[in-house]
C-alpha cells in the first residue's frame, strides 16, 4: 500500500484545492417586483417571466 514519503505542506494542499469554491448564484432584476431574485425561480409575490403564476397568500399543506 502506498504511503506518502513526506507530509503535504499547507501551501501544496491549498494550491491543489484552489479550484474548489462556491459559485456565485445567478441573480437578475425582476421588473414586476423591483427586486433581485434567483434566475428560473418564482418570485415571492408569485410572478414568473412577468406573469402571475401563483397567489402569494395561498399556502399549500403537505399532509
UniProtKB/Swiss-Prot annotation:
One of its GO terms (cellular component) is large ribosomal subunit. One of its GO terms (biological process) is translation. InterPro entries: Ribosomal_bL32 (IPR002677), Ribosomal_bL32_bact (IPR044957), Ribosomal_zn-bd (IPR011332). The keyword Transmembrane does not apply. Residues 7-20 have a biased composition (Basic residues). Residues 54-63 have a biased composition (Polar residues). One of its GO terms (molecular function) is structural constituent of ribosome. Residues 1-23, 42-63 are annotated as: Disordered. Keywords: Ribonucleoprotein, Ribosomal protein. SUPFAM superfamilies: Zn-binding ribosomal proteins. It comes from the Bacteria. PANTHER family: 50S RIBOSOMAL PROTEIN L32, LARGE RIBOSOMAL SUBUNIT PROTEIN BL32. Belongs to the bacterial ribosomal protein bL32 family. This is Large ribosomal subunit protein bL32. It comes from Lactobacillus gasseri (strain ATCC 33323 / DSM 20243 / BCRC 14619 / CIP 102991 / JCM 1131 / KCTC 3163 / NCIMB 11718 / NCTC 13722 / AM63). The gene is rpmF.
Amino acid at each position: 500500500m502506498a504511503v506518502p514519503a513526506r507530509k503535504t505542506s499547507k501551501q501544496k494542499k491549498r494550491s491543489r484545492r484552489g479550484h474548489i469554491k462556491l459559485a456565485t448564484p445567478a441573480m437578475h432584476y425582476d421588473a414586476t417586483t423591483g427586486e433581485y431574485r434567483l434566475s428560473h425561480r418564482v418570485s415571492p409575490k408569485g410572478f414568473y417571466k412577468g406573469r402571475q403564476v401563483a397567489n402569494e397568500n395561498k399556502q399549500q399543506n403537505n399532509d
